[in-house]
Design a protein with these regions (language model features):
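C-terminal transmembrane helical hairpin of 12-TM major facilitator-type secondary transporters
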Residues: 189-235
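A late C-terminal transmembrane helix in Major Facilitator Superfamily
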Residues: 246-277
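Extracytoplasmic gate region of multi-pass secondary transporters
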Residues: 111, 115-170, 234, 267
Length: 344
């Protein structure tokens, strides 16, 4: 996803591009939740769920391999006007109309990357985001079925409601983030990230206070709302990752994907330790923990977020780094020569 965004997204359309590209997190559950719920209660059983999803995945992968190109320059359906719009302003990747730089800088300045607080703001925010996302994706059906005691055939349908709403919120957030001009880019990042992660954290804490036995409908509404609101993240840290790291955004998104995998493993472990019996009181603790993580990581992002391209994305930085490395190698050799000549 990072490589595709880096190469194919125009800088002025980062928000909507990221929103559409990352909407797989919403589109997949819209299909998976109700279909799996219907199949697992039918006569064909669970094996059909795996066969169906395997077939769909194979078809989509084949279509992607046939249609996709790594660079817009290599795609036969791209004309010159589209290329200018997509490639313009991308530093070492593109120098202007008809001047694609073949010597584009692929070296990632790791020391500068990991010492940049704007990058740490993105990574910390992504950790909080995916802790909330994985809780919703993996355990929303469990909460609805085991805590709210909704029948399993209705659980899938109820679980699919929030991804549908979240999909449209994500598109709205991406489009509005690109089009709003009366607010600075940095403040837009803070506002959209707070609407997504901050509000999700608050709603998780509110849900922890509600009684699932006497207020099941209200609990379901708050749970769905907490997941839907996360759609605003396309205008938050996701967009910041593109704005800060520019041509190196694929590496930033690779780090974000790694944190998603960490959260994918950490969330079930946390739930197993705290709420293995699915008791409402235990689930309240889980919701409190995730709510605090979301709120704290959002505050960190708001403090250190940036909307400007980092210094290490510029050609001048790469040139200076090469000169510095050359100096470190040449200076000792020259000193050695000076000592030899002095001895003579």
């Amino acid at each position: 996803m990072g490589s595709i965004t880096s190469n194919w997204s125009a800088l002025k359309q980062n928000g909507i591009f990221i929103a559409i590209l990352s909407s797989f997190l919403q589109i997949a559950p819209i299909f998976t939740m109700p279909v799996s719920g219907a199949l697992c209660t039918s006569s064909v059983g669970w094996p059909t769920v795996y066969y169906l999803h395997g077939t769909v995945s194979l078809f989509l992968f084949t279509f992607f391999m046939l249609y996709h190109r790594n660079s817009p320059i290599k795609h036969p359906m791209m004309d010159r006007t589209e290329l200018v719009k997509v490639l313009f302003g991308k530093g070492s990747i593109y120098n202007g109309p008809g001047q694609h730089n073949k010597k584009k800088n692929k070296r990632i300045p790791l020391r500068a990357f990991y010492s940049d607080m704007a990058i740490w703001a993105i990574l910390v925010a992504s950790f909080g985001n995916f802790m909330g996302t994985q809780l919703s994706l993996q355990f929303m059906p469990t909460y609805i079925n085991k805590v709210l005691h909704m029948p399993i055939e209705n659980t899938g349908l109820a679980s699919a409601i929030s991804p549908i709403i979240m999909f449209f919120i994500k598109l709205l957030a991406g489009q509005s983030s690109d089009r709003i001009k009366f607010i600075s880019d940095k403040w837009k990042l803070r506002i959209y990230n707070s609407l997504s992660m901050g509000m999700m954290g608050v709603l998780f804490i509110v849900l922890a206070f509600l009684d699932p036995h006497s207020q099941p409908t209200l609990c379901l509404v708050v749970l769905i709302a907490s997941t839907c609101i996360l759609g605003f993240n396309s205008g938050g840290f996701f967009k910041s990752s593109q704005m800060v790291s520019r041509q190196h955004s694929h590496f930033t998104l690779a780090n974000i994907s790694f944190l998603n995998c960490v959260c994918m493993l950490l969330t079930p472990l946390l739930n197993e330790v705290i709420a293995s019996d699915n008791a409402p009181a235990d689930w309240a603790v889980v919701l409190w923990i995730h709510g605090l993580i979301l709120c704290c990581t959002n505050v960190f992002f708001c403090v250190f977020a940036s909307a400007e391209s980092a210094a290490w994305t510029l050609d001048t930085f790469a040139g200076a780094a090469r000169k510095t490395r050359r100096k470190r190698l040449v200076t000792p050799i020259e000193r050695g020569k000076g000592v030899e000549e002095g001895g003579r």
